[in-house]
């Protein structure tokens, strides 16, 4: 469980969770601790290339970034020839289909629905080879603990298959009613357009993601897993950061906090993620957004509450508000 970290054993923290659950701010604050590096949502480095290289947290395009440039640049082609050769050819720049195949295959295997068009082993070997290269090249940059906030439990499952990686899974949860309001506000400009259908679909997606995250934690080979509530992190960031550092086995030294709830974010090289957070540096106040308690439409609130009640209770959230 707590094997010593040898020279070839890299540590990666993977943050799982539903959208609008706070994974980006948690990874940003963690990445501001000495010895930790926030990579952002690593899976999107490749998937976004068809629409042009995304902008790194340092404000340069990923392919021009001094951190990412030689990780995802042309030299990757030779390294990935063996693992990507076959049906998809040997073009490592078009890996979105591979990534999608892996996610769909893993979900089907866990939910026991649908038929498999390609073997799980074939898909896993190809995707794992790609991510192994990315993680190990990133670790070679500075040897620190890497943080991947890609959210989807399927990517966490792939991480668990990479040799030479000491992986840690963190399941980040947030009150689904708060997450739903964040989604409504973002999508509809705060108009309150949270119809019954939208609330029902949201609740179903929230339940599925968190159910799969729990499965990923149970299947994780090392048992190095924990759950963090967004609200607890906002209320006591120091306690959460220390707990995570203890799990990883790293002395964090001085925490990037000023006072109880102000984080001091340092410039980062996040490849993807919430732009409102990852492009920030300097002091950022950490506070839980309770606007949903006043603004969320009662119908949407009731639907989300009823449908997510089992996990609301499991995660310690009140049913009645």
For every predicted segment, state its role:
Residues 22-36, 159-164, 227-252, 268-271, ...:
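PAPS/PAP-binding and catalytic site of the sulfotransferase fold
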């Amino acid at each position: 469980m707590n094997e010593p970290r040898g020279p070839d054993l890299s540590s990666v923290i993977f943050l799982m969770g539903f959208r609008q659950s706070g994974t980006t701010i948690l990874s940003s604050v963690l990445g501001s601790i000495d010895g930790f590096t926030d990579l952002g949502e690593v899976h999107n480095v490749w998937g976004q290339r068809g629409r042009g290289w995304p902008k790194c947290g340092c404000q340069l395009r990923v392919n021009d970034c001094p951190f990412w440039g030689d990780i995802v640049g042309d030299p990757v082609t030779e390294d990935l020839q063996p693992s990507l050769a076959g049906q998809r050819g040997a073009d490592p720049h078009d890996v979105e289909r591979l990534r999608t195949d892996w996610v769909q295959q893993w979900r089907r295997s866990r939910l026991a629905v649908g038929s498999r068009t390609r073997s799980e082993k074939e898909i896993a070997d190809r995707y794992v080879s790609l991510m192994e290269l990315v993680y190990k090249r990133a670790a070679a940059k500075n040897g620190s603990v890497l943080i991947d906030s890609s959210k989807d439990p399927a990517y966490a499952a792939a991480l668990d298959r990479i040799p030479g990686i000491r992986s840690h899974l963190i399941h980040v949860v947030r009150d689904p009613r708060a997450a739903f309001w964040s989604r409504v506000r973002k999508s509809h400009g705060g108009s309150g357009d949270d119809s019954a259908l939208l609330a029902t679909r949201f609740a179903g997606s929230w339940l599925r993601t968190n159910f799969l995250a729990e499965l990923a934690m149970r299947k994780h080979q090392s048992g190095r897993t924990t759950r963090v509530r967004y609200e607890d992190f906002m209320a006591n960031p120091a306690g959460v950061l220390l707990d995570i550092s203890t799990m990883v086995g790293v002395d964090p030294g001085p925490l990037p906090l000023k006072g109880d709830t102000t984080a001091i974010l340092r410039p980062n090289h996040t490849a993807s993620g919430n732009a409102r957070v990852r492009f920030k540096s300097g002091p950022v106040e950490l506070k839980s957004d309770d606007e949903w308690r006043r603004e969320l439409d009662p119908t949407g609130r009731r639907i989300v509450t009823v449908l997510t009640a089992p996990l609301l209770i499991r995660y310690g959230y009140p049913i009645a508000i």
